[in-house]
Every structure is written in structure tokens, then in C-alpha cells.
């Protein structure tokens, strides 16, 4: 069952360059390219966040396996975390809207970045 409507334009679905994905609204580091993997859904998929507080999580009503995720800094809606649905047993799958992300290529991060 799909949780989100797909309208196309998922520019980061098949994007696998080294770097860091940050919140498109505030620039907070969210995901490293090292945690990104190919998945059959139309949205970019990640296994983990860069920082423990990169995302805030809210239970999805009537769906215990899904959490709505938003930027841990500004609250921008990002997508969902699907528990135990990652590429390896016990891993989560973060299914994130490309429009909520901005990509920073490796070597172009801010000096304090811990991303990649």
C-alpha cells in the first residue's frame, strides 16, 4: 500500500554521487550518500540519518510499521520511515521526497560537516 501520492520529479531516486543530503528548507544535514540504496519505490531510500536528531518522528495513524519524518531542525516534512523494511534485517527504510532534499557533493560541505 502506498502512503504517498507519486507525482514524478523524484530527481534523487537514482542519484548515487558521494555527498550529503540536507533539508531543502534549512540546510540541516539529514542523510549521507553512504546510507542511500536502490529501492523499487519511486522515492529515494536511505537506511539511516547522519545525526541522531536529523529527523523528528511521528507515528503514522493505524500503521505501526510507518513513521512520518520531518527535519529535526525546522520541521519540514520529509516522508516516512518504514521500520524493518531496509535492505538488511532489522534496518529501516527512509522513503524521502526529493523536493524536501538538497544535495551537497562530497568536498563541498561546510567545514563543520560530519556527513561524508
Swiss-Prot record:
Q: Which InterPro entries match?
A: Met_Sox_Rdtase_MsrB_dom, MsrB_Met_sulfoxide_reductase, Mss4-like_sf
Cleavable signal peptide: none
Q: How is the cofactor bound?
A: Binds 1 zinc ion per subunit.
Looking at the record, the residues that make up the MsrB domain are: 1-106
Xref: SUPFAM superfamilies: Mss4-like (SSF51316)
Q: Which domain of life is it from?
A: Eukaryota
**Annotated active site:** 95
Q: Which GO terms describe its molecular function?
A: actin binding; L-methionine-(R)-S-oxide reductase activity; peptide-methionine (R)-S-oxide reductase activity; zinc ion binding
- Which positions are annotated as binding Zn(2+)? 23, 26, 71, 74
- Per the record, what is one GO cellular component? cytoplasm
**Coiled-coil stretches:** none
Q: Which GO terms describe its biological process?
A: actin filament polymerization; innate immune response; protein repair
What is the uppermost EC class here?
oxidoreductase
Q: What does this protein do?
A: Methionine-sulfoxide reductase that specifically reduces methionine (R)-sulfoxide back to methionine. While in many cases, methionine oxidation is the result of random oxidation following oxidative stress, methionine oxidation is also a post-translational modification that takes place on specific residue. Acts as a regulator of actin assembly by reducing methionine (R)-sulfoxide mediated by MICALs (MICAL1, MICAL2 or MICAL3) on actin, thereby promoting filament repolymerization. Plays a role in innate immunity by reducing oxidized actin, leading to actin repolymerization in macrophages.
Q: Which family does it belong to?
A: Belongs to the MsrB Met sulfoxide reductase family.
| Protein name stated in the entry | Methionine-R-sulfoxide reductase B1
Source organism phylogeny: Eukaryota, Metazoa, Chordata, Craniata, Vertebrata
